[in-house]
Amino acid sequence: IVDIHIVSDEYKLVSKKWKAKPTSIDLGDNIFIKDGEMAVITGPCSIESEEQIRAVVAHCVENDIKMMRGGVFKPRSSPYAFRGLGLEGLKLWYQIASEAGIKIVTEVMQTSQIEEMYPYVDVYQVGARNSQNFNLLDELGKVDKAVMIKRGISGTIEELLQSAEYVFSGGNEKLILCERGIRTYE
């Protein structure tokens, strides 16, 4: 073999070659995520209490931050670690955040959670551990909400784009790719 030429990209729909139009995601209330503009999302790793939610929402309001992240369903390395407040915690968070005009970004870990979370979430987050959960990505392709995919722990850029392709090919073009850093073996 002297030379190799790729005839077809594995991520046609999300490639700038095929979709040159800049992305603009409308989250409502005049809050947009756009190409070329930095979007700040702040918040704790996990949502743990009403007091914590109120404190972080107040911080967001004081600093003109429109999006808050946090986990109500947490994938933990240890089965004994706190795994989040679940759906009831999300409902409480939504009530407090929506009163302040703050959008919610939170992780969905399995397909069965998508529908129950839908009324309370503005951006579904696919965490690093689930960035190649193809059943989850397929189902998120069918929802009319933004999806933020974090790059996998040891994932390549190509794998991140292929994960995005699953969501996009299902019809959901409201995609955010999150570069979270990776673990290498160098």
Residue locations for each model-derived region?
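Conserved anion-binding
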Residues: 72-76, 130-186
